[in-house]
Design a protein with these regions (language model features):
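Nucleic-acid-processing active sites and adjacent nucleic-acid-binding tracks
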Residues: 202, 223-225
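ASCE P-loop NTPase helicase motor core
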Residues: 89, 97-169
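Short beta-strand scaffold segments in enzyme catalytic cores
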Residues: 217-223
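Nucleotide donor/acceptor-binding cores
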Residues: 1-2, 113, 205-206
Length: 225
C-alpha cells in the first residue's frame, strides 16, 4: 500500500478534473467507480469542508489486502498545507508554482517516490518548464503529447480548432510547445519574425534604445535595417 496526493490549481478544479478522472463524476454517485480506480477498490472517503462533492482523502483498497490512502490538495491552499507528510506518489495537474513543486519533491524524497506533472505550458517558458526542457536532471523524464497523439481528434476537428486560436497559441495548444514569455509582444509564430544570425552590412542604419525600468526590468534593444 502507498500514500499519495493529487493536486490542482484550486479545490474546485481538483474535484472537477483529478477526482473525476480517478473516481468518476463527483456529483453523481451512480457513476462512482467509473474513473481510473474501480468501485471494488474504493473505500471510505472524507469530505472537504466548504467544497460541495469534493473529497479531502479516500481509502483505496490495495491488492495485497492493505489500504492505500489518497489525499486531494490545491495550490491555492499555500505551501504550508503541502508540508510535513511522507508520500510515495504525488500527481500535480496544471503547472504548480515553484514552491509547491519543491514541496512535492521534498514530500517524496525519503521514500524514493515519484512526482508526476501533467499540464499544457499555458504560462510560457517558466522556471519549471525551462528546467525540464533545457536542463533535464538525473531521475527526471519529460514527454510531450500533441494532437497527433490523440486519435479521437480528426483532421477536420484539428483544423477547426487551429483556425479559432490566436496564431501565437497554436503550437502551444497543438504540440505542447511553450510560448516565449507569459505573453508575446508579436502575436505571430516566432519563426515568422526571426532569422539565422548574419553579419550586418556596414552601411545599414542602426538605432540603440533603452528603457530604464521603474516597476519592471530595464531593457535595451539594438536595431539595424
Amino acid at each position: 500500500p502507498i500514500r499519495a496526493w493529487a493536486g490542482g490549481s484550486s479545490n474546485e478544479t481538483t474535484r472537477d478534473m483529478l477526482q473525476r478522472e480517478l473516481l468518476g463524476q463527483p456529483d453523481d454517485k451512480t457513476v462512482r467507480g467509473t474513473g481510473a480506480i474501480p468501485m471494488k477498490n474504493i473505500g471510505e472517503a472524507t469530505r472537504k469542508p466548504g467544497v460541495p462533492n469534493a473529497h479531502n482523502s479516500i481509502v483505496i483498497r490495495h491488492k495485497s489486502g492493505g489500504n492505500s490512502r489518497l489525499g486531494f490538495k490545491a495550490y491555492e491552499m499555500g505551501k504550508e498545507k503541502w508540508m510535513g507528510e511522507s508520500l510515495d506518489v504525488i500527481w500535480l495537474d496544471e503547472e504548480p508554482p515553484p514552491e509547491i513543486y519543491t514541496q512535492a519533491v521534498t514530500r517524496t524524497a525519503d521514500k524514493g517516490g515519484m512526482v508526476y506533472m501533467t499540464f499544457t505550458p499555458e504560462n510560457g517558458m517558466t522556471e519549471t518548464v525551462a528546467q525540464f526542457m533545457n536542463d533535464l536532471r538525473n531521475g527526471q523524464f519529460m514527454m510531450t503529447a500533441g494532437w497527433d497523439d490523440a486519435p479521437h481528434m480528426t483532421e477536420d476537428v484539428k483544423e477547426q480548432i487551429l483556425a479559432a486560436l490566436p496564431p501565437h497559441e497554436r503550437k502551444m495548444r497543438s504540440l505542447g510547445i511553450p510560448s516565449l514569455g507569459s505573453g508575446l509582444v508579436f502575436p505571430v509564430p516566432e519563426e515568422i519574425i526571426t532569422c539565422d544570425p548574419f553579419e550586418i552590412p556596414a552601411h545599414w542604419p542602426r538605432i540603440s534604445g533603452m528603457d530604464y525600468g521603474w516597476d519592471h526590468p530595464t531593457t535595451a534593444a539594438w536595431i539595424a535595417w
